[in-house]
Every structure is written in structure tokens, then in C-alpha cells.
């Protein structure tokens, strides 16, 4: 009898959340954030507790689910430095050093709260499986679990707008559910070409109390790119694609 | 602690200045407009204080006829300029390096073109370069035994830009789906004639080098060769791979045919031996949860000297010095100086070395502050150098570094016979 009651309750309250296809929703969130292949400009701002800022400007290209590359345009001390990500592989090229070196996703080439995985973000669906979805009013909460151990954050709690299917907030967690950082998506803007998405991403972290990092997007547009642009050999030349 | 205070003070000072102009986060898209040209570079000043080891062989070799006391000051300044001009598929790039040095020898001023080449990019798969450039082959951080077409880098400053050679090279890249994601081929021609690359090796030769790069099963793999006569034929391979999100491994192997080694015994008799030399490097980079990065490398230098050969060399210098003190005749010391240049005098001239660098990102909650410590151990004779440094890059385009080096070793050992016991330097570098 108790089992039958439980079954009725599950049917009444459980089905609505499981009825949502989490994987399809996550893929939709990815596509709403940006086209599968695109170019964009970004400004990264690291803000210290006293309000002091340090800014970086990057040109970024992405192709498919797992290829992304960026080159620093400013400040002068960083100009020409480029980063490349192919799936779990990441490299950093410094013109003076003259050769790409492998870096890891948890490091940060710019300091501040954003790490390399944040700066070279792939599609969420490329790195995470959807464990479950909850619908709370006009908001979805997607519980994401990393597909492999090489992904920077083991778990994500992705809060998505129920209508626009765009992320509002993402909590990045360790395997033990410890909060590493929170990413906020703000200022939805029409970039043209059907791309309407948040133009500002902010992040803070209990590990960096008082610090904040901000990423502002500009000139985001779909672009067809050759696979060869996403190779180590091409890293010194990424700026030629601008 | 004093440093922490100093950096905190600087942070506060510049913080006040930027607060005065605090504003909302804006991104002016005019910043992203592309110009066909670029001019930039950096200027730096670097005063150095050396603590001399007056009993060391290399001190005697350099200062036998002068007394510079127990410390030596040196004032260095560098201006590195780079410029590029881009039009269509063509790009011209030049990087020059001007060094000013004021030392016990007086003033010295030298400008070198580190790189200057024309690059043509007819497609995203093909790039062709002609001119002076550095190739920087190899995966090692401190050493690169497979960098056959580069000048040797200084393991104490592995990130400094180096002067290149005049070459003609191409890069052909192809990408695939599947376990083999990328393959690229880099053929290189290195002419060596009078006034053209004449420090590379024997002159009047046209040398050919090449590199095949594969990204296979998430592993970078290079196969490398050099032949042509200026240097003996040599082959190499290297690899690099991320094991986890915070752990990377890399390695290099070089096989040099008929390597010619010139060495002296303690009497000063010169010997030449020829053999196939095998050099190797294995290393790792590891990032801890507390944001400390460790770089560990073991280097087997197949072209290096044994402990006995090195002791003979130092003993010969000491003999030359004793002769000079007794008779005023410096002929033996001059012979020792001749055999030092490019041979015993190259960085890490012996056989087995261990390199460890630990750098901690932003401790004490000071953003952009990175303290590091680097140790290089000569495994054969247990002599070593230890270099702590503090880097602060919190002010846009300005990099401040305080670095010290302490070396230790028994008499007739690699580091024990260096001319300095210690070194302290401050470097301020401004990028523009």
C-alpha cells in the first residue's frame, strides 16, 4: 500500500521535472549563448577589493563543440599571447618564449577569478551531462555532472531563464559539492544575426573574497573557420584572422 | 615581509589613483579596430650586485690580473622594440634588442636584430617565412636538447627572447577528426656562409632541418632532424601530454651522430673524442590546490663533461693561475679562456642536472604577486644554485621583479667554481 502511495506521489510531483529533456535544454542554452562557430571580442576586467582594476582585451574564435582559441590584443604586456583549447588540451603561446606550452584548465593566464577553462569555455553540453532538471517558477535549474575527471568543475548548478533559455547564474562546485565560484550572466543584448544573449559575465568566489572578475562581449558573430586555425602551429598567427 | 609591505604599499598607492577614475564596466569597441601595423616592445632597467668567490677557478680565469674586491656592481638596461606591417597575405615582423651594460669593464652598448622576417600566408594551411627567426623547438622548460636550430637558452632565464638564425621555412598544417587531430610539417633551410649564420657551425654549407608535429591521442609529438654539414647530423623527438587538469608531462630525446668533444687534462693537453651523443629530458608541470606550480625536469646532457673532465679543467685553470702568480706569465690562462668559450663555458656543461621551480600565485591575497624559487642541481657533483624571486605585475604594463641567486658546491665542482657565490638583481620592465 505504501509503495502504491509513493508511486502516486511520484507520478503527481516527479514527472513534471523529469518530463523536461535536460540534454536538449542544455544544448539549447549553448546555442542561445553563441553560434557553434563564431568570432568575438571580449574585455576581461579583474576587480580588487579596493576597486582597482586590470583589463585585458581578447579576440576569440570558436569552432564546433571543442575548439576555441584567443589572442590578447591589450594591454601591451600581454599583446600577442594566445591560448588554444582542443577538448581537454590547452596551450599558451608567449611571443617572447616562442613556442606553445601546455597549460591546465585550473590555471589562469590572466590571474583573478576566471581560470583558463572559463576563458576558453566550450559548449556546456560538450563537457557535462545533465543529471536532473528542476523547474522553479520561471526558471530552470539544471544539475550538471562533468563527463570526465579532466573537466575543471566536477559539478555545475545552472540556473536558466525559463523563457529565453539563457543562463542567469552558474554555481561551480567540486565533487564534494563545495562552491568554487559563482558566474552571473547579465545585460542581455542583441548582437545581430539572431544572437541575443548576456553581454556581461561576472564571477566571484569564496576562495577570492572581495575579488571579482568581469567579462564583456562585443562583436559576437557567426563565422565559418578552418580546422587548421585551431592548431599549435597556427597560434602565433591567430590575430591575422581579425 | 618587507617585500609584502612594499608591494602592498604600491598596490594601495596605485589603487587610490584608479579609484579616482572608477567607472562602470565598459567596452569601447573602437579598441578592437585592427591596424595594418603594430609597434611595441619593452624597456627595462636591471641593476645587479654580484658576491664574488675569489677562490673559484672561474674567478681566477676572469680576474687574475685585476682586483675587483668581494662584490661587483653592474647596471643593465634593455630596449626591445618590435614592429609588424601586414598587407594581404604578407606580414613583415622585426624585433630588435638593445642592451646597455655598465660594469667593471666600462660601458657597453649593443643592438641586435633578434628576429626580422617576411611571412606569407596563402592559406590557413600554409605559411612561408624568410628571414631571421627563432624556431624554439622542444617541450622542455629549462633545457631543449632537440632545439637543433636555436641558440642555447639560459636555464636561469628560460623565457628571455633569443637571437634567431637566417632561415627559409614553411609550415603546412592539416587537421583531422579522430585520434590524430593535427599533423604539421615544418621544413627549414639554414644557409651558413661568411657573415650569414657563421656562428651556427662550419661555413659554406646549406643545412636542412625539419619537424613533423602530430597531435595524436591528446599528445603532442614532434619528430625532428638536422643535416647538412655545419653540424653533424642529428635526430630528435619530443612529447607533451596533460594527464589531469593540473598535471602535465613532457620529454625530449636527441641523437647526435659523431659529436666532437674537445677537453683538457689538468696539464693543459687538449684531447678530441668523437662519439654518437644521446641527450634526453623528462619533465612535469603540476599545479596544487593552493595554486602552486611545480616544474620538475631531469636533463641528461650526452654532449656534457664528466666530473673527472670538469675537475681536470678547473685544475688546469688553477695551475695557470699559480703560474701567473709565480712568473707573471698568463699563457696557460689564455689557453684556458680559449677552451672555455662555447665549450666548458656553455650553460650546464656537465651531464646530469635536475631542475625544480616552485611558484605560488598570489599568496597573502596580493593579486598579481608571484613568489618563486628555482633550484638547479648538478646530480654528479651535488653542487647547486638556488634562486628565489618575487614578481609583481599589478600595475598595467609594468613588471617588477626582485631576484637573488645563491650557489653552492665543493671545490672543483660545477657550481662551486663559478665566479660568483651570490647575485641580487632588481628588474623593472615597462611594456608599451
Regions found by a protein language model. Name each.
Chain B
Residues 19-128, 390, 399-405, 419-428:
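Beta-barrel outer-membrane channel/assembly domains of diderm bacteria
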Residues 41-43, 94, 130, 170, ...:
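Membrane-embedded beta-strand positions of outer-membrane beta-barrel proteins
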Residues 45-51, 85-89, 98-102, 134-136, ...:
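Transmembrane beta-strands of outer-membrane beta-barrel pores
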Residues 71, 103-109, 160-162, 197-206, ...:
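Solvent-exposed loop/turn segments connecting transmembrane beta-strands
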Residues 77-190, 214, 409:
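Outer membrane beta-barrel
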Residues 88-93, 125-128, 177-183, 216-223, ...:
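Repeated loop/turn-to-beta-strand initiation elements of outer-membrane beta-barrel proteins
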Residues 170, 354-358, 419-432:
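Outer-membrane beta-barrel "beta-signal"
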Residues 236, 248-365, 374-375, 415-417:
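Extracellular/periplasmic loop regions
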Amino acid at each position: 500500500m505504501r509503495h502504491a502511495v509513493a508511486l502516486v506521489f511520484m507520478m503527481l510531483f516527479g514527472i513534471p521535472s523529469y518530463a523536461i529533456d535536460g540534454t536538449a535544454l542544455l544544448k539549447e542554452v549553448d546555442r542561445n549563448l553563441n553560434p557553434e562557430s563564431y568570432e568575438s571580442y571580449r574585455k576581461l576586467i579583474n576587480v580588487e577589493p579596493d576597486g582597482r582594476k586590470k583589463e585585458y582585451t581578447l579576440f576569440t574564435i570558436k569552432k564546433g563543440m571543442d575548439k576555441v582559441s584567443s589572442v590578447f590584443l591589450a594591454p601591451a604586456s600581454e599583446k600577442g599571447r594566445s591560448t588554444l583549447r582542443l577538448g581537454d588540451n590547452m596551450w599558451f603561446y608567449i611571443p617572447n618564449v616562442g613556442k606553445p606550452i601546455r597549460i591546465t584548465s585550473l590555471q589562469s593566464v590572466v590571474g583573478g577569478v576566471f581560470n583558463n577553462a572559463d576563458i576558453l569555455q566550450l559548449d556546456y553540453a560538450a563537457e557535462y551531462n545533465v543529471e536532473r532538471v528542476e523547474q522553479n517558477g520561471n526558471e530552470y535549474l539544471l544539475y550538471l555532472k562533468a563527463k570526465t575527471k579532466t573537466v575543471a568543475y566536477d559539478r555545475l548548478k545552472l540556473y536558466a531563464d525559463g523563457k529565453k533559455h539563457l543562463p542567469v547564474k552558474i554555481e561551480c562546485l567540486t565533487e564534494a559539492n563545495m562552491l568554487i565560484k559563482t558566474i552571473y550572466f547579465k545585460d542581455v543584448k542583441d548582437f545581430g544575426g539572431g544572437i541575443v544573449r548576456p553581454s556581461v559575465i561576472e564571477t566571484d568566489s569564496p576562495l577570492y573574497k572581495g575579488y571579482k572578475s568581469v567579462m564583456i562581449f562585443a562583436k559576437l558573430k557567426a563565422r565559418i573557420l578552418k580546422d587548421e586555425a585551431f592548431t599549435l602551429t597556427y597560434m602565433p598567427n591567430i590575430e591575422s584572422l581579425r | 615581509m618587507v617585500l609584502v609591505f612594499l608591494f602592498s604599499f604600491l598596490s594601495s598607492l596605485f589603487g587610490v589613483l584608479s579609484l579616482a577614475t572608477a567607472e562602470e564596466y565598459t567596452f569601447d569597441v573602437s579598441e578592437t579596430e585592427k591596424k595594418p601595423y603594430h609597434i611595441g616592445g619593452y624597456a627595462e632597467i636591471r641593476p645587479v650586485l654580484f658576491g664574488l668567490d675569489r677562490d673559484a677557478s672561474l674567478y681566477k680565469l676572469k680576474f687574475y690580473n685585476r682586483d675587483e674586491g668581494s662584490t661587483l656592481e653592474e647596471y643593465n638596461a634593455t630596449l626591445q622594440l618590435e614592429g609588424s606591417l601586414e598587407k594581404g597575405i604578407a606580414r613583415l615582423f622585426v624585433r630588435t634588442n638593445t642592451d646597455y651594460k655598465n660594469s667593471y669593464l666600462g660601458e657597453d652598448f649593443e643592438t641586435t636584430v633578434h628576429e626580422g622576417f617576411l611571412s606569407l600566408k596563402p592559406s590557413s594551411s600554409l605559411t612561408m617565412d624568410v628571414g631571421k627567426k627563432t624556431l624554439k623547438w622542444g617541450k622542455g622548460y629549462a633545457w631543449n636538447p632537440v632545439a637543433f636550430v636555436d641558440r642555447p637558452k639560459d636555464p636561469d632565464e628560460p623565457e628571455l627572447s633569443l637571437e634567431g638564425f637566417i632561415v627559409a621555412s614553411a609550415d603546412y598544417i592539416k587537421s583531422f577528426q579522430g585520434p590524430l587531430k593535427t599533423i604539421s610539417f615544418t621544413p627549414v633551410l639554414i644557409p651558413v656562409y661568411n657573415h650569414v649564420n657563421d656562428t651556427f657551425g662550419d661555413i659554406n654549407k646549406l643545412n636542412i632541418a625539419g619537424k613533423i608535429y602530430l597531435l595524436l591521442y591528446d599528445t603532442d609529438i614532434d619528430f625532428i632532424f638536422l643535416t647538412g654539414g655545419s653540424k653533424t647530423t642529428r635526430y630528435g623527438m619530443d612529447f607533451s601530454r596533460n594527464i589531469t587538469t593540473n598535471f602535465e608531462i613532457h620529454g625530449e630525446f636527441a641523437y647526435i651522430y659523431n659529436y666532437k668533444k674537445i677537453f683538457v687534462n689538468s696539464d693543459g693537453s687538449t684531447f678530441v673524442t668523437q662519439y654518437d651523443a644521446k641527450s634526453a629530458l623528462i619533465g612535469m608541470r603540476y599545479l596544487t590546490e593552493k595554486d602552486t606550480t611545480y616544474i620538475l625536469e631531469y636533463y641528461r646532457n650526452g654532449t656534457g663533461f664528466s666530473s673527472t673532465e670538469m675537475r681536470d679543467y678547473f685544475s688546469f685553470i688553477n695551475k695557470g693561475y699559480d703560474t701567473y702568480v709565480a712568473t707573471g706569465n698568463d699563457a696557460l690562462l689564455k689557453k684556458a679562456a680559449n677552451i672555455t668559450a662555447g665549450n666548458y663555458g656553455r650553460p650546464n656543461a656537465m651531464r646530469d642536472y635536475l631542475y625544480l621551480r616552485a611558484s605560488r600565485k598570489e599568496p597573502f591575497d596580493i593579486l598579481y604577486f608571484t613568489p618563486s624559487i628555482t633550484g638547479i642541481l648538478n646530480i654528479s657533483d651535488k653542487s647547486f644554485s638556488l634562486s628565489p624571486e618575487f614578481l609583481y605585475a599589478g600595475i598595467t604594463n609594468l613588471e617588477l621583479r626582485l631576484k637573488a641567486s645563491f650557489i653552492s658546491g665543493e671545490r672543483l665542482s660545477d657550481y662551486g667554481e663559478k665566479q660568483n657565490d651570490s647575485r641580487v638583481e632588481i628588474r623593472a620592465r615597462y611594456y608599451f
